[in-house]
Amino acid sequence: RDDVLTYLEENGCYTIAITNLPDLFEKYRLCYGQYKYVKFALGFHPELVYKYKNQIDKFRSNIRYTRYIGEIGADFTTEDYREREIQLEILSEIVSVCNQYDDKILSVHTRKAEKQVLEILNNCKSQVILHWYSGTIREIEEAIEKGYYFSINHQMIRSNNGKKIITKIPLERILIESDAPFTMGLEKNYSIKFMDDIYKFLSVTRNVDEEQLGIILKNNFRTILTQG
């Protein structure tokens, strides 16, 4: 992963690098905080909060070092109801802490917990990006009405449900993510070429040439940084 960060920096790729625990954010901020193109997000991944819930204090103490928050959220693939409760409690606390600032941008995980997460986000004053969204079309419409953005990756265009979801999102609300190393083809070797397939898919489905598409997507990124 250190090689990936160096690759992004050397290639001038503006990137928000997501972390999954406050410990890791702290580590990478100290090691790579001087990078120009790569900025680190303070994360507390829902699948880890039950085991590491004591790190919420470290989350609070590190939030002043970044405006980027993620990955956070809830993941109800677990059948443990106590774990689900803890996920929602931690998410609510994170939203509350972020509301004390006026510049936070949140990358939010919602897998199988879209309804519950969107309810908590009703109280959120920060800008929201829904990461690898896989919920219902009705909830997409609700999120769009609230001004949320959606980050999509190349693995989404390899499933019918993923493609269906992407076609329902306004082009002006789309951001590109890799979700490496958890997506196909990026487990070991990272390259920004993963974006090529996304550009081709969006170009065909939206009838927009790739050059214009690039302008729109870059503008989306600039816009959310300005609004956050």
Question: PLM features: residue spans?
Answer:
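Mid-domain alpha/beta scaffold segments of enzyme catalytic cores
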Residues: R1-G228
